């Protein structure tokens, strides 16, 4: 079997609240780390989320 092209990643909040989203990305086309602006319900604002490893 071939290795899957999509991998699961964890998007950690940069606000320091500990909130995160789990999503997937194509490892072949998106080789750099992903950063996305999403809603953080702990601080009730849109903040930047950066990619981290799923432990």
Curated annotation (Swiss-Prot):
Signal peptide: none annotated. SUPFAM superfamilies: Zn-binding ribosomal proteins. It comes from the Bacteria. GO terms for cellular component: cytosolic large ribosomal subunit. One of its GO terms (biological process) is translation. The keyword Ribosomal protein applies. Keywords: Ribonucleoprotein, Ribosomal protein. InterPro entries: Ribosomal_bL33, Ribosomal_bL33_CS, Ribosomal_bL33_sf, Ribosomal_zn-bd. The keyword Iron does not apply. Pfam families: Ribosomal_L33. GO terms for molecular function: structural constituent of ribosome. HAMAP family: Ribosomal_bL33. Belongs to the bacterial ribosomal protein bL33 family. This is Large ribosomal subunit protein bL33. The gene is rpmG.
